[in-house]
C-alpha cells in the first residue's frame, strides 16, 4: 500500500475518487479480507470509507478492526436511506469513540 495513501475504501469495489483533490496513488479500494495484508496503515491515511453493511461485514466490524489496528482518523459510513438515521448514527458513534475514531455517516 502506498505510503502517500490518504483515502481507503473498504468493501466498495466501484469506489471512485475526486480528482484532482485526491491523486490516484493517494486512494485505494480493497476488500475487508485484503485489509490485513495492508497493515500497518500508513500515517498519511486521513479517511476510510465503508458501507453500513454488505455481504462480508458491517460497520461495527470495520470500527473494531480499524480501532484495533491503531487507526485514529475519520471513518465515513455510507448508508442507504434509513427510517431513523439518528439512532443508527448514535449507536455507531458510541462504538467509534471507544476505538478512538471519528465517525461520519452519509447516504
Q: What is the meaning of each model-derived region?
A:
Residues 9-11, 48-52, 75-79:
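Conserved beta-strand segments of the P-loop GTPase G domain that flank and frequently precede/overlap
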Residues 38-45, 63, 67, 93:
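ATP/nucleotide-binding catalytic cores
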Residues 69-75:
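A short helix->loop->beta-strand "cap" motif at the edges of active sites that frequently abuts
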